[in-house]
Regions:
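Acidic, glycine-rich active-site loops and adjacent beta-strand->loop/helix elements
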Residues: 1, 75-81, 107-112, 135-140, ...
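Condensing-enzyme catalytic core mediating Claisen C-C bond formation in acyl metabolism
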Residues: 1-47, 145-202, 206, 210-213
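Buried hydrophobic positions in well-ordered alpha/beta secondary-structure cores of metabolic enzymes
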Residues: 4-6, 60, 72, 90, ...
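Conserved catalytic cysteine-centered active-site region
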Residues: 30-34, 39-50, 78-130, 241-261
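Phosphate/pyrophosphate-binding loops at sites that engage ATP/ADP/AMP, CoA/4′-phosphopantetheine
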Residues: 56-70, 210-225, 246-249
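Short glycine-rich or small-residue beta-strand-to-loop segments that form or flank ligand, phosphate
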Residues: 70-78, 104, 229-230
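Short beta-strand segments
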Residues: 75, 131-137, 159-160, 170, ...
Length: 261
């Protein structure tokens, strides 16, 4: 059996009220008022994705012996260093053994799940020791944009191994498509955003349900047997839309924390 053996998280204390931001910029972008609910987390001036990753990892590893960690994977699209291994800095801050293998993963917002997949593949291959997975984001957005209300700052961490498993890994399915709902070119500070309906209609009504259905079929799991369905939704109500298309009951939909992170 392989899977997650412990977990941790870090969410900055500071908050940006979506209502306050929307009201301040509604004169230029009235559409912001539709997203003026809840708040998002906001990193302080001395925080970035690396410092948040360290805090999440410390939360996950609290009270544990770290000598058995054999690898560290750090997923983010906002690594502070372009040519200096960020994962190595996380390992140093955690005082992990110098003999561990460390890797940065980026290039897309699925960097965190890519890091988790790499750790699970490592465990499935029977490699010795646990793998530490950290994911963190500190994304910048244009002032007055919808993304300013959506891009919360936070980090999560997991250890993956084959003993003392608290969440068994049953399987996965991946779909690799060059879907351009947004992008950020090298050297650019902000994302270039395309029509948001394109994201909803093409990605969340087509590609995401296809991946979920394929994963369930591969593992021979009835969609109605799912008790917890968690989707990283950029805007509200997408979880219900995807769950319905996948045959997952509405009662299984978990809070995406969109309203507080």
């Amino acid at each position: 059996m392989i899977g997650i053996t412990c977990y941790g998280a870090y969410v900055p204390r500071l908050r940006l009220s979506r209502a306050a931001a929307a009201q301040a910029n509604a004169w230029a972008n009235p559409g912001l008022l539709a997203q003026a609910r809840g708040e998002r987390s906001m990193a302080n001036w001395d925080e970035d994705s690396l410092t948040m990753a360290v805090e999440a990892a410390r939360d996950a590893l609290a009270g544990r012996n770290t000598d058995g960690i054999g690898a560290l994977y750090f997923g983010s699209t906002t690594h502070p260093f372009a040519d200096r291994q960020n994962a190595g800095l996380v390992a140093a801050a955690l005082d992990l053994p110098e003999s561990i293998s460390s890797s940065d993963l980026g290039g897309a917002q699925k960097a965190g799940t890519s890091a988790l997949n790499a750790a699970l593949d490592r465990a499935a291959a029977g490699r010795p020791g646990e793998a530490l997975v950290v994911a963190a984001e500190h994304r910048r957005a244009r002032p007055g944009s919808a993304q300013e209300l959506q891009y919360g700052d936070a980090a999560a961490a997991f250890t993956v191994g084959s003993s003392a498993v608290i969440a068994e890994f049953l399987g996965s399915h991946s779909v690799s498509v060059d879907f351009v709902d947004h992008y950020r070119a090298t050297g650019q500070e902000f994302d270039y955003i395309w029509e948001e309906r394109w994201l909803r209609d093409e990605a969340f009504q087509k590609w995401v349900p296809a991946a979920v259905k394929a994963a369930l079929e591969k593992m021979e799991i009835d969609p109605e047997a799912i008790h917890h369905f968690v989707l990283a939704e950029p805007v509200a109500k997408l979880s219900a839309l995807v769950a319905k298309r996948c045959g997952i009951t509405e009662t299984a939909i978990a809070d995406s924390l969109l309203g507080v992170v």
